[in-house]
């Protein structure tokens, strides 16, 4: 009887002890923290850490399948970071659009190597072995670095980071309007258009105010002096222009006078030549008339061949009548000469 009663009691005690041990061990096991990741998240506030030492950065997005496939490889590579003497980081482009703009990330996933502020793009696969060989064999030395305006630390890329951060905020605001508040998409677009116009007008007003603040007006006496100087300069310029025009007019008048004198001299020369020609013509006509008259008067006696004077006289009279100039012809010649003289006189005037 005693042995039968002790058996159930021992069993109950053993069960209670096991339960107590399990109760005490459970919270300890639950309190153990999970394995900490060696990949350091990079943000806009701590990204300058990559300017010192050697780093490998990965740009990813939570919705990217290719990025999710390389997560385990990237974690394994980060665990060996102490052995490789390299730091490993990652950037979420959804949460940090400014950093994606600073590094000008256009494809995902994107990998970058940084060594003392010099950045290079890693274009190999995101596999642990390839990443490890890239560091151990120093394959990054054969890759052209991002220098000049392409460097993430340059002023150009800083401006690009600002633009990307603004675009990210606008995108989040658009999602808030359309998803959270349920506003139609076109209403959101109208809101952004109006906001852009208002912002532009406000910036223009600010620039005008700044220019007015930095613009120092001249004192009154200085402004009056400057106005007087300006007027005197304008008057001096007007006088110079007037003098130049007068000189030009004088030169034109002198040229016209010279041309008129030359024309008058030419006309006088032509008139003298015409008068000489007329005098020659008159002399020739007078000489012809004198010759004809002398021939008419100088008719000889009758010939030795026995021809009587009475027979010859009618013939010579007829020849003299035919050869003697007609008074009407001489009058016509004299009239033509007079007309020519009057024409030349008119030309001379």
Swiss-Prot record:
Disulfide bonds join 64-67. The modification Phosphoserine is found at residues 251, 259. Residues 225-349 are annotated as: Disordered. Residues 242-284, 312-321 have a biased composition (Acidic residues). Residues 225-240, 335-349 have a biased composition (Basic and acidic residues). GO terms for cellular component: endomembrane system; endoplasmic reticulum; endoplasmic reticulum membrane; nuclear inner membrane. The chain crosses the membrane at residues 190-210. It comes from the Eukaryota. This is Thioredoxin-related transmembrane protein 4. It is a single-pass type I membrane protein. The active site is at 64 (nucleophile), 67 (nucleophile). Residues 1-23 form the signal peptide. Pfam families: Thioredoxin. PROSITE patterns: THIOREDOXIN_1, THIOREDOXIN_2. Coiled coil: none annotated. Keywords: Disulfide bond, Electron transport, Endoplasmic reticulum, Membrane, Nucleus, Phosphoprotein, Redox-active center, Signal, Transmembrane, Transmembrane helix, Transport. Residues 30-137 form the Thioredoxin domain. Gene3D superfamilies: Glutaredoxin. One of its GO terms (molecular function) is disulfide oxidoreductase activity. It is found in: Nucleus inner membrane; Endoplasmic reticulum membrane.
